[in-house]
Structure formats: C-alpha cells, structure tokens
Amino acid sequence: MIVVAAQAQMPGVSMNLPLKIISTDFDGTFFAEFANPPVPDELQRLIQRLQTAGARWVINTGRDLSSLLETLARAHLCVRPDYLVVVEREIYVHERNRYVGLEDWNRACAQAHEELFARVRTDLPRLMAWVNERFDAAVYEDSYSPFCLIAENNSDADIIHDYLNDYCARVPSLTVVRNDVYARFSHAAYSKGTALSEIARRLSVGPDLILAAGDHLNDLPMLSREHARWLVAPSNAIALVKDAVRKQDGFVSDEPHGHGVARGVQFFLESAGVAETSLNSKT
C-alpha cells in the first residue's frame, strides 16, 4: 500500500554505529536477477543486524515504485528497506507496513521537472529525429521524462549520450541519467545523491556516517564524498564507477553484486573498529 503524508516523521538513529545509513542501488548491486538467490543470504543478514543496531537502509534505484515493490515481493527477502528512492529522485519511507511518500520533496521534485521539461519540449522532435536517423533505438516519452532512450547496444548509447550531454550543457539544470543502454532527461537537482542527502538531513545524519554502493552511471551522483563517506562498488561495476570509487578511497570488491556489497560493508565496519560479530546476532 502506498500513501502520501504531508510530512513523514522519521525517528532518529542510534549513535553507536559508524554507519547510520546504507544506500544501495538495486539491480546489479543489491539484486542479481539471474542469481539464486538473487540477494545473498549473508547480505540480508548483515543489513538486518545493522538495522537492529539502529542503521537505516535505503534502496536507491532507477526503477519506478510499482516495479520495485513487485520485485521485492517476489524475492522473499528477510529484510525490508527503511526508505526507497525510485526513478532516481522520489522518496518513500516505510511506516506501519506501507511506504509513505515524502510529499514536500516529491511535490517540489515533480514541479521542478514539469517546469524544466516545458522549456525543452520544442526541441524534442529535433533530438528524437537525430537519434532515429542514425541508430536503431527506441525513443519515447513516459510519465517521468519527455525523452527516454533504449539504445541497441552500449556503443550506440555512448554516442547518443555524448550528443545529449552537449545539448544539456546549453539548458540550465538539464541532465541525462543513464544506466547501461537506458537513458532519460532529468533535473540535475534531483538525483540518487541529492535524494540520499535529503533522507540524511531529515535523520540528522552527516555524510561521514553514510555508505553508498552502486555499479553503473546513474549511481555516480551518490557515489560521492559529498553524500557518503564510505563508497562501495561490486566487481561487476563498470570501469567509470570503479575509477570514481577508487579515487575517493572507496572499496572495489573482487566479488559481484550482493556478495561485493557485503564485502564492502564488512570492510568499512572493520576499518571503523566494529566487528560484524559485535552486532546483534539474534537475526
């Protein structure tokens, strides 16, 4: 069930953990669709123990809300995220067995996108024509963006991405959000990173107490010391993500997906002097 609250009340977090917020991308990072299980049991148990000790877990994804909730239900996890960031910008908090939209943030986000997209709408036919004349790609509009792309392959997506970036450079606040062959226009002020920091602001948690894990281009805004001190990339992350994480003294695992995330969380807990066995072990 999804409801909207004017101002969701967020309880404070325990003060005895070096990680107060764990923000994970979903597909390819926390969740591996073709793995069995899609989320390693060890990662689920680790997150569960951290939550019991007072940490908050955020799934930070490009999926829309219905798609994410459906996949979570089918995965039969033993843990539940405290917060959801969907389509890289909308925030929901778990309260009383339901996810409640943060109305003030989500309303401002929707208004900012509406105003921005109104400014670029007259240019869209030209942009779509440029893509369609050169590539076998799907270009379309949905409820989240007037320009969405599914390229045939990553090489085509790279070229189209460069073209769109050149256009965005001439339009204040416009950016391209990309994951693999998928891309769409978005407002630069609303990203995985700014949404994570908004959650942290409401919880009175600074970036030094936040861990973020991701694998692809749309994760780069949150894989930044501006938003999180502890940065993690699994072995399946693309090279640009691994480079960004390494340059900020983050952890690049030699294991993929959820196993890699677990290694990263364990590494930073140990670096901060917290042994995993010292967490609540009843779960």
Regions from the PLM with identified roles:
Residues 17, 185-186, 193-283:
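Mg2+-dependent phosphoryl-transfer enzymes with acidic/Ser/Thr/Gly-rich catalytic loops
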Residues 1-14:
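N-terminal amphipathic/basic-hydrophobic helices that include classical n-h-c signal peptides
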Residues 39-136:
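Active-site phosphate-binding/coordination module
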Residues 21, 83, 209-211:
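Structural motif
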Residues 125-213, 217-226:
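Conserved acidic, metal-coordinating active-site core of Asp-based
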Residues 18-35, 223:
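Asp-based phosphoryl-transfer active-site loop
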Residues 22-27, 87-89, 144:
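Short loop/turn segments at strand-loop or loop-helix junctions that form parts
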Residues 95-104, 191-192, 267-272:
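Short, surface-exposed amphipathic charged segments that create phosphate/polyanion-binding patches used
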